[in-house]
Amino acid sequence: MDISIRSIQQDELSALLDLYKHLNPTDAPLPDTSTLEKIWNEILSDRKINCFVADWEGNLIASCILVIVPNLTRGARPYGLIENVITHPDYRRQGVGKCLIHHALQFAWGHNCYKVMLLSGRQTKEVLQFYEKAGFKKDIKTGFVATPISD
């Protein structure tokens, strides 16, 4: 399988949203097209936000977002946050996600990040092992998540 890992292109919003259907199948409905396009343009124009995709024969089969956050500690080195990691179910367990995460980490290291953090909502043994094999350690820090009361 010849897969290309690259930054997403502006005209690939629809393909990304199709892929995201496998991320959180019970997600809230999306807003109208004009709102989506506004958010999409905001994401694409922010140099701190990097959306990487795995492309196989013109199809987006995996994606993740890496946000690089400027920082005034740790020698003023930035840190990274990875979110929305998804591989299409038909392409899981084939090394696609591993290549994608590796690409995101190399990008972060190339931008002098002193660490990259990731939270996973899935706690299955396979998912946790996937992230550990990709270089993440689960026992260095404790993660907390707050959500609005209305959610």
Task: Write out the residue ranges for each language-model feature.
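Residue-level recognition of the GNAT/N-acetyltransferase active site
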Residues: 9, 88, 121
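Short coil/turn motifs at secondary-structure junctions
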Residues: 69-71, 90, 123, 149
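Short beta-strand-to-coil "C-cap" segments at the C-terminal boundary of structured domains/repeats
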Residues: 145-151
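Conserved GNAT acetyl-CoA-binding A-motif
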Residues: 101, 108-120
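Conserved acetyl-CoA-binding loop-helix of GNAT-fold acetyltransferases
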Residues: 87, 93-106, 133
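A short beta-loop-alpha structural element at the N-terminal edge
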Residues: 3-16
